[in-house]
Regions:
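Conserved GNAT acetyl-CoA-binding A-motif
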Residues: 106-118
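Conserved N-terminal entry element of GNAT/NAT acetyltransferase domains
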Residues: 1-14, 146
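Conserved acetyl-CoA-binding loop-helix of GNAT-fold acetyltransferases
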Residues: 85, 91-104
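Acetyl-CoA-dependent GNAT
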Residues: 10-14, 18-21, 25-75
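A conserved beta-turn-beta hairpin within the catalytic core of GNAT-like acetyltransferases
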Residues: 69-80, 90, 136
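Conserved catalytic-core motifs of GNAT/GCN5-like acyltransferases
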Residues: 115-117, 121-123, 127, 132-146
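Conserved beta-strand segments that form the floor/walls of ligand-binding pockets within enzyme
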Residues: 53, 65, 79, 84, ...
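Residue-level recognition of the GNAT/N-acetyltransferase active site
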Residues: 12, 86, 90, 119
């Protein structure tokens, strides 16, 4: 596989048929019963969401998003979500390129920082791509839906 064959672009409605199964590789949530039209409309309504797909030979092999948060103090911050690369494409720098694309979006939107949450086994991957842990910083989550 040649690196230049991966094309990154903004996610489109038609991509959901491939993005949802890809997300299944990331989490145990069952996306098969979700109404893709409703999901797409909710995604579009949130104009702070910026999702992109990576295409290889016309097939979606990667997905990621960066949510832009406008701060009251006049700055913007980005939060990376749902980074996933198809199992068949892992180890081929697709994830590295996906992160670079999302960082560029953050720069274009004027973000002063980007944060992300990841599982411990992925920590070194993100550190190699410029992210750092912050001492004494702990992520807390409150799930409102199962």
């Amino acid at each position: 596989m040649n690196k230049e064959k991966i094309e990154f672009r903004k996610v489109e409605r038609k991509d959901l048929e491939e993005v949802f199964p890809l997300l299944q590789q990331l989490t145990e949530i069952d996306y098969s019963s979700r109404n893709k039209g409703v999901c797409w409309n909710l995604f579009l309504e949130n104009n702070s969401s910026n999702g992109i797909v990576g295409l290889y030979e016309g097939k979606v092999v990667a997905y990621g998003a960066i949510v832009i948060e406008n701060k009251i103090r006049g700055e913007s911050a980005g939060h990376i979500e749902d980074i996933v690369v198809d199992k068949s494409m892992r180890g081929k720098n697709v994830g590295v390129d996906l992160i670079k694309e999302l960082v560029e979006i953050a720069k274009e939107k004027g973000c002063y920082r980007i944060t992300l949450n990841c599982d411990e086994p992925l920590l070194n991957f993100y550190k190699k791509n410029g992210f750092a842990t912050k001492e004494n910083e702990i992520t807390l989550k409150l799930y409102l839906k199962k």
